[in-house]
């Protein structure tokens, strides 16, 4: 694999030399076998400078030669004999000075020497473009821009690209490093470990914007196992032509031959990010894109003009009339981009590695795309790479984005979970590495540390690290980055067999438990065994789903619980009967269910509150718990977990007399409300009980693990109040959402501080008093700016909600 040093430095800003970088890459396991110099013009035009022809006289002994004096930036001009018919005094020309090495068309070198031509000394050569490798013309010398200064290096004038290219002997398991970005990611980890503070720079795709939606091509993936993720977008109005010099130089440096600007961009992104892409001529696509297999024996002609016979398991990219491309391996002749192409469908996908490997082997094909798909690419950058390529195509080929990104991604590809035991690290490596160092190394490799204990770490491994799925793999990563040279080898070597402890994700649970403890909650741990009769208390629980014990100790302990509610109500009842009626309880626990296809376990977090909010005190008047108190606790937990993209929905469970559900992407995260009196009566409870049930399994899947913080604003915030007369059916949430949509940038907070329903109001109306906090983080707001925002909010409320000011 070839890696350009200049390209690498786009992702890692460093002043390290190529030698230092090469050594570190080798230490990290990315063995640099050769470092080659690359120059966009062979020889780099070293020794060639701009010359100013001062005089040009006919050679005294040769009709076709001229004797010139040329200023090449030295103290004295030099004499050069030239045979070109177009040389003349006053010109600025390229001059190859004494000792310069030039190359002919076949690549053979020749050196410029001082000599005599027909008795006249010549101290260099005025060059034609073919002599410099800038073209094929030999009609005459090159005449340069008159504004150039004598002595200016030609490499500067002609913008010769100089680079150093690492030839890396990449092992098959390191699919994550098969790109410049992946190599830079490893390099960052190694540099951080060596005390060099660097950041990994990711190219931005923030300016990806659809110009018009005039060419949408739908996608149908018939086998999501073979194509777990597929994205596409259309670009119209492009011009297929030669790529700009910078793009050609990038590709040439790593040994690729530029084709045209569209193909070159797909190759560029492939080697930049490791994501294979394919561009189809959109005009040649009939109907929609269909990803499927075709019958055994189907004929298909690929880009190399070879007719191939397809296997029934070959995954194909087709349209409604037939095949277009062998998925992840090779394009088809009829659908490829040509000089006449004006619109394209750009594909970015994640294909099954085993399927691609078998297809490539069957057809004897080994392409850059199949090479990466076979080893496993990063499933999380499919859309990002598509946007990156689309932006580059717009830059080098013009055109407009004419569709939204079409994506088929039915089931998210999950990351790997590994539990790392510190003692096992020591046993394998033979030397104790500080725990903080281990954590820093793992974080630098984009491995998330989910939980920390004295004995080890709970880790989440990115899906693109297909080679790191076990504890021993993690230890290898630690050792690789820590440095083999930093390990002291003893004379005696010990070998042990490591155990695999179960994976735990207690860190998040402990954080939330601590938060609830600080809010006055007590943690409870109820028995998972309960009575089968509880399933009859709710229609949402089914008796046929009960997991029953074969030999229970009693009928009250005969069934694995389907809900945490009833064991919680048992605890509430127990405490009330002992004169402890002000309660805040929580429990992390599992529920158990039997279905036709087997058994399932689901982890939940339950909250129960009942009685008074606080203990009786002369400073705090007695106030009972209510739904809004519970809602505050729930929202606080979600905020602590960094879950903010939530919405409310009607509660589905029939255990509540009143309640609501909080959803994330249409999946229910939490159900909460007041428990029905009929259920409370079964437990002998006469006071209201509020209950919240968190789907903890789902929460663990969606939390990001890191919460971003921002500095305290330097500029003051401003509060403005509105008293709105609204319909009884209007909710605070609808006002909140509408306000946020109306003023996204400067509206920081909204608070409902008074509700009035009663006399002097029209029938069916109520009054809400709301405060609006407005702030600009970059400057102090003026009264006119604030008034404009408040006027916009007022008009929106009047238009959308029929509200009026009181």
Protein language model annotation of sequence segments:
Residues 5, 23, 27, 39-40, ...:
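Glycine/proline-enriched, intrinsically flexible loops and inter-domain linkers
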Residues 118-133, 137-143, 154-164, 316-414, ...:
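Mobile "lid/hinge" segments at catalytic clefts and subdomain interfaces of large enzymes
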Residues 74, 115, 290-330, 334-337, ...:
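Class II aminoacyl-tRNA synthetase-like tRNA-binding/catalytic domains
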Residues 1-211, 345, 364, 368, ...:
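Phosphate-backbone binding interfaces of nucleic-acid-interacting proteins
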Residues 2, 27, 444-447, 467, ...:
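A carboxyl-terminal module marker
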Residues 49-80, 151, 253, 260, ...:
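Conserved mixed alpha/beta core segments that line enzyme active sites in large multi-domain catalysts
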Residues 418-581, 720, 773-777, 785-806:
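Extended, well-folded interaction surfaces typified by the phenylalanyl-tRNA synthetase beta subunit core
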Residues 40-44, 207-209, 496-497, 501, ...:
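Beta-rich nucleic-acid/ligand-interaction surfaces
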């Amino acid at each position: 694999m070839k890696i350009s040093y200049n390209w690498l430095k786009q992702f890692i800003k460093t002043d390290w030399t190529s030698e230092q970088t090469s050594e570190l890459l080798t230490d990290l396991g990315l063995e640099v076998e050769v470092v080659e110099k690359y120059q966009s013009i062979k020889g780099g035009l070293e020794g060639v400078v701009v010359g100013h022809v001062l005089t040009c006289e006919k050679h005294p002994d040769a009709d076709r030669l001229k004797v010139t004096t040329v200023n090449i930036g030295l103290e004295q001009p030099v004499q050069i004999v030239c045979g070109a018919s177009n040389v003349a005094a006053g010109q600025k020309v390229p001059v190859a000075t004494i000792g310069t090495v030039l190359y002919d068309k076949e690549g053979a070198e020749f050196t410029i020497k001082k000599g005599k031509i027909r008795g006249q000394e010549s101290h260099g050569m005025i060059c034609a473009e073919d002599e410099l490798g800038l073209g094929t013309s030999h009609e005459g010398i090159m005449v340069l821009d008159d504004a150039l200064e004598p002595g200016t290096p030609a490499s500067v004038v002609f913008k010769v690209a100089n680079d150093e290219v690492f030839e890396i002997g990449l092992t098959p398991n390191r699919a994550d490093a098969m790109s410049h970005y992946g190599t830079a990611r490893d390099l960052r980890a190694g540099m951080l470990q060596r005390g060099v503070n660097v950041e990994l720079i990711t190219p931005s795709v923030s300016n990806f914007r659809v110009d018009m939606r005039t060419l949408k091509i739908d996608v149908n993936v018939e086998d999501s196992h073979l194509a777990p993720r597929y994205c596409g977008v259309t670009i119209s109005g492009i011009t297929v032509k030669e790529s700009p010099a910078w793009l050609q130089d990038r590709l040439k440096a790593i040994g690729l031959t530029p084709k045209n600007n569209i193909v070159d961009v797909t190759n560029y992104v492939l080697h930049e990010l490791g994501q294979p892409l394919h561009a189809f001529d959109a005009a040649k696509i009939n109907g929609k894109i269909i990803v499927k297999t075709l019958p055994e024996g189907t004929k298909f002609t690929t880009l190399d003009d070879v007719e191939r016979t397809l296997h029934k398991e070959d995954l194909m990219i087709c349209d409604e009339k037939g095949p277009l491309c062998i998925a992840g391996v090779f394009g088809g002749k009829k659908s490829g981009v040509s000089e006449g192409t004006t619109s394209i469908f750009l594909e970015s996908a994640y294909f099954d590695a085993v399927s691609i490997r078998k297809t490539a082997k069957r057809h004897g094909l080994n392409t850059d795309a199949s090479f990466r798909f076979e080893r496993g690419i990063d499933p999380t950058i499919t859309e990002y790479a598509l946007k990156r390529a689309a932006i580059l195509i717009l830059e080098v080929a013009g055109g407009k984005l004419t569709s939204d990104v079409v994506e088929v991604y039915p089931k998210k590809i999950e990351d790997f979970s590994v539990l790392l035991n510190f003692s096992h690290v020591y046993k394998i490596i033979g030397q104790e590495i500080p725990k903080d160092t281990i954590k820093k190394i793992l974080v630098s490799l984009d491995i998330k540390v989910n939980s920390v204990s004295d004995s080890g770490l709970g880790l989440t491994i990115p899906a693109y690290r297909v080679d790191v799925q076990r504890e021993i793999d993690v230890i290898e990563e630690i050792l690789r980055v820590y440095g083999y040279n930093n390990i002291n080898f003893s004379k005696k070597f010990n070998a042990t067999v490591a155990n695999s402890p179960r994976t735990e994700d207690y860190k998040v649970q402990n954080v939330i438990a601590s938060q609830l403890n600080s809010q006055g909650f007590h943690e409870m741990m109820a028995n998972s065994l309960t009575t089968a009769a509880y399933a009859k208390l709710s229609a949402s629980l089914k008796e046929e789903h009960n997991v029953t014990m074969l030999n229970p100790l009693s009928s009250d302990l005969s069934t694995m619980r389907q809900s945490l509610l009833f064991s919680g109500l048992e605890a509430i009842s127990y405490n009330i009967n002992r004169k402890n009626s002000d309660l805040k309880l929580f429990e992390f626990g599992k529920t158990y269910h039997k279905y036709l296809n087997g058994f399932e376990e689901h982890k939940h977090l339950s909250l129960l509150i009942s009685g008074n909010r606080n203990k009786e005190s002369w400073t705090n008047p007695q106030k009972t718990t209510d739904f809004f108190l519970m809602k505050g606790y729930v929202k606080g937990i979600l905020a602590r977990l960094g879950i903010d993209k939530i919405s409310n929905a009607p509660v589905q469970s029939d255990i509540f007399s009143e309640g609501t559900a909080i959803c994330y992407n249409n999946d229910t995260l939490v159900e909460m409300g007041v428990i029905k009196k009929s259920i409370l009566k079964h437990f002998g409870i006469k006071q209201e009980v509020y209950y919240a049930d968190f789907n903890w399994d789902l929460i663990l899947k969606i939390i990001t693990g890191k919460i971003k913080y921002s500095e305290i604003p330097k500029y003051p915030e401003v509060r403005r109040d509105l008293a709105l007369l609204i319909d009884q059916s209007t909710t605070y949430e609808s006002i909140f959402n509408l306000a946020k949509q109306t003023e996204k940038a400067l509206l920081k907070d909204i608070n409902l501080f008074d509700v009035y329903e009663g006399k002097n109001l029209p029938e069916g109306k109520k009054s809400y008093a709301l405060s609006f906090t407005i702030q600009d983080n970059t400057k102090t707001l003026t009264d006119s700016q604030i008034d404009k925002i408040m006027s916009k909010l007022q008009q929106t409320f009047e238009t959308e909600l029929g509200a009026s000011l009181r």
